[in-house]
C-alpha cells in the first residue's frame, strides 16, 4: 500500500516555490515519442502519442499543464503516475492523464499480473492494470515498486 506524504510539505512556501520552478521549466519542454529500430530512429507518421504530448494530452489540460502537474507530483511524492487511455476500437492511445490520489494499493492476481487500485479524493476507487500506467519513481531504493517517500526527512526539515 502506498500513501503519498501527507505532512503538507507542498504547503510550505519554500518547498512549493522550488517544485513550481522545476515544474514550470519542465512544462516548456516538448517531449517526443521515439521508436528505435536497429539503433536508428524510426519515423512514425501520424504518431498519436507525439500529437498528445505536443498539444492536449487529455480533454482537461494542455501539454504544459500536463507536464507541470506530472513533475510537481514526481518531486512532491517521489512517484508519479500517468494513466494511458486506449481507444477500444483502434487500439491507439486516446489520452494520457496524470493521476492525483491519496491512496494506492498494488494487487496481484493468480497469474502474477499487477493492478493498481487508486482511491481518489472523493472516495472513488478504480482498479487499473499496472501495464496501463506510466510510473516514474525517484529515490527508488527500499521498495520493489515505489520510490521512497519524503515523510521522515520532510518532517525533520520542516520542523527545524
Model-identified regions with their sequence ranges:
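Structured, contiguous alpha/beta core segments that scaffold functional sites
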Residues: 1-160
Amino acid at each position: 500500500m502506498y500513501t503519498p506524504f501527507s505532512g503538507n510539505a507542498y504547503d510550505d512556501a519554500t518547498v512549493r516555490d522550488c517544485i513550481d520552478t522545476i515544474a514550470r521549466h519542465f512544462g516548456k519542454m516538448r517531449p517526443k515519442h521515439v521508436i528505435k529500430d536497429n539503433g536508428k530512429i524510426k519515423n512514425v507518421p501520424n504518431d498519436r502519442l507525439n500529437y498528445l504530448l505536443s498539444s492536449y494530452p487529455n480533454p482537461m489540460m494542455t501539454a504544459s499543464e500536463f507536464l507541470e502537474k506530472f513533475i510537481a507530483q514526481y518531486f512532491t511524492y517521489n512517484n508519479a503516475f500517468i494513466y494511458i487511455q486506449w481507444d477500444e476500437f483502434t487500439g491507439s492511445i486516446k489520452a494520457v492523464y496524470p493521476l492525483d490520489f491519496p491512496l494506492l494499493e498494488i494487487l496481484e492476481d493468480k497469474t502474477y499480473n499487477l493492478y493498481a487500485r487508486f482511491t481518489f479524493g472523493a472516495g472513488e476507487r478504480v482498479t487499473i492494470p499496472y501495464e496501463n500506467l506510466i510510473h516514474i519513481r525517484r529515490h527508488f531504493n527500499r521498495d520493489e515498486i515505489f520510490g521512497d517517500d519524503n515523510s521522515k526527512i520532510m518532517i525533520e526539515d520542516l520542523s527545524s
